[in-house]
Amino acid sequence: MKCTSKIYTDNDANLDLIKGKRIAVLGYGSQGRAWAQNLRDSGLNVVVGLEREGKSWELAKSDGITPLHTKDAVKDADIIIFLVPDMVQRTLWLESVQPYMKKGADLVFAHGFNIHYKLIDPPKDSDVYMIAPKGPGPTVREYYKAGGGVPALVAVHQDVSGTALHKALAIAKGIGATRAGVIPTTFKEETETDLFGEQVILVGGIMELMRAAFETLVEEGYQPEVAYFETINELKMLVDLVYEKGISGMLKAVSDTAKYGGMTVGKFVIDESVRKRMKEALQRIKSGKFAEEWVEEYGRGMPTVVNGLSNVQNSLEEKIGNQLRDLVQKGKPKS
């Protein structure tokens, strides 16, 4: 079965559409730094908008990119790219962008959260679109410098000019994404699937599955060190195999015993009740319930996050993991 989506590549994107336009990248963290440098190296006019002078300000200067206070960066910008954390964007928008941006400037996002959940209400005369790279900022930069690119998603929320998609693809080309491929989506789809993946697999699901497996073995009297290797440490090797060869490639690489055990017991553990709760988690995302809770949590200083992190840091598996990582490092051959 082939991919059902159109995949945009370099031939579908034209940098000339945005050459000569002033691009303000807001934020200079992982993604902000990568985007700003890649767009600059693609021959585009880039400035960085920051709320205060500090380490990021000096880093931008050392990278050869002009840092400005956010208000100054956006006032002459034709394209404004939000690359600050989700929960910072609304305040930044209300205080430092909306009152100062010029009429008709494009608003660009790397994640749909604030637009989809209406935390930011964009002007009716602005094009609003998204380019969401499927990799961390350092990888976006590294691949670009090596002549490649990280795949991305592209979406248009508001197309006043009639050329929003074309400009989005030009930005995607500027950061190197069209070298790999850019898949069209919507703000709704990107936001909901991104949150779902984080919650049930990438962060929440994997974390709780590892911890539950480790604790089960320890409670049954097995050595914590052995339990850690079998339930947590070896996960990387399997994930690397899936990343490189897919799920079937991973299965071909493991022992027949592992294949049989995985195919039988895996469905016993991850059964229909788990799938039902996954759907419930998805409904919380789709209804906006999760977003409401997260905004409230953030406003209270993130007590759930702070307490949860403390719990993990003080857990037996974390203490054992710290010790075993030292052993692994000692055993690595000297380069």
From Swiss-Prot:
NADP(+) binds at residues 28-31, 56, 86-89, 137. Pfam families: KARI_C, KARI_N. It is an enzyme of class 1 (oxidoreductase). Its cofactor is Mg(2+). It catalyses: (2R)-2,3-dihydroxy-3-methylbutanoate + NADP(+) = (2S)-2-acetolactate + NADPH + H(+); (2R,3R)-2,3-dihydroxy-3-methylpentanoate + NADP(+) = (S)-2-ethyl-2-hydroxy-3-oxobutanoate + NADPH + H(+). One of its GO terms (molecular function) is magnesium ion binding. InterPro entries: 6-PGluconate_DH-like_C_sf, KARI, KARI_C, KARI_N, KARI_prok, NAD(P)-bd_dom_sf. Keywords: Amino-acid biosynthesis, Branched-chain amino acid biosynthesis, Magnesium, Metal-binding, NADP, Oxidoreductase. Binds 2 magnesium ions per subunit. The active site is at residue 111. Residues 186-331 form the KARI C-terminal knotted domain. Pathway: Amino-acid biosynthesis; L-isoleucine biosynthesis; L-isoleucine from 2-oxobutanoate: step 2/4; Amino-acid biosynthesis; L-valine biosynthesis; L-valine from pyruvate: step 2/4. Its EC number is 1.1.1.86. The keyword Oxidoreductase applies. Involved in the biosynthesis of branched-chain amino acids (BCAA). Catalyzes an alkyl-migration followed by a ketol-acid reduction of (S)-2-acetolactate (S2AL) to yield (R)-2,3-dihydroxy-isovalerate. In the isomerase reaction, S2AL is rearranged via a Mg-dependent methyl migration to produce 3-hydroxy-3-methyl-2-ketobutyrate (HMKB). In the reductase reaction, this 2-ketoacid undergoes a metal-dependent reduction by NADPH to yield (R)-2,3-dihydroxy-isovalerate. Belongs to the ketol-acid reductoisomerase family. NCBIfam families: ilvC, PRK05479.1. HAMAP family: IlvC (MF_00435). This is Ketol-acid reductoisomerase (NADP(+)).
